[in-house]
Amino acid sequence: MDARIDQVVTTGKVTLDDEEYEVESNTYIVGDDDEVIVIDPANDAEAVLKAVGEREVMAVICTDGNEHKLSTVLEVAAAGEEDEENWAPIALHRADRLLWRDFFGRLAREEEDEDDATALRSLEPDIWLEDGGVFEIAEAQLEIVHTPGHTPGSVCVISEQLGVLFSGDTLHRGRPGAIGGVYDDLRKQLNSIGALLTPLPKDLRVLPGQGDETTVGEEDARWESWGALARDGEDA
């Protein structure tokens, strides 16, 4: 059966540099009537799992390690299963390991049960994403592209079969992706976006981590003008 893409929009909060920002995030569920891969379950696990329904979650891909994505990842991977051996594998790029450890370390400090706290502190992703890595679901391939800048371990996901680029928070419609207008390493992010877009078909759909969809051609035409954002940041 051919793969399809379901989208879930959720809202939540994320804290960066002691500032709290409200975010509206896109989660994408890729698969068929039986099996799916979930890309960026954010903010609201219940809403994501409702969209998954009775289908089996085969993997959970996080395009970066920011807290609004990690906050639901265990619940979505479990998908109602109590036995951890039956949970879907969680995938994250190793360069965001510090963000992962910081988030679950904070959860551990809030946990009253010491065994549970120890488990949270020792928790690691099941799969470390690598540039060029491929997942398969419902006869579609999902290729990982490392796009550092938004975070050190940010990735995008390309599927030629589905004609789509899942750009996470690396690239939003009309601008480089950011949370609350805050950029981690904008120059590196812009370089990643340029390298990402250049070889891709101009009509390829772009499904971002926040906001409306766009196309490679639309964003490629805007890319050079974004260099002013990086220069302004250096002059500030």
Labelled PLM ranges:
Residues V9, G31, E130, E136, ...:
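Residue-level detector of conserved, well-ordered beta-strand and adjacent loop positions
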Residues D18-E20, E124-D126, H146-P148:
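Short Gly/Pro-enriched turn/cap motifs at secondary-structure boundaries
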Residues D6, I61, A91, I127-L129, ...:
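Hydrophobic/aromatic beta-strand patches that form the interior of the parallel beta-sheet core
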Residues V23, D44-E136, A140, R222-L229:
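Active-site HxH/HxHxD metal-binding segment of metal-dependent hydrolases
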Residues T11, P41-A42, R94, D131, ...:
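Fold-independent oxyanion-binding glycine-rich loops
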Residues V36, R106, V134, Q141-A236:
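Metallo-beta-lactamase
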Residues D2-R55, C156-G168:
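Conserved beta-strand hairpin/beta-sheet module of binuclear metal-dependent hydrolase folds
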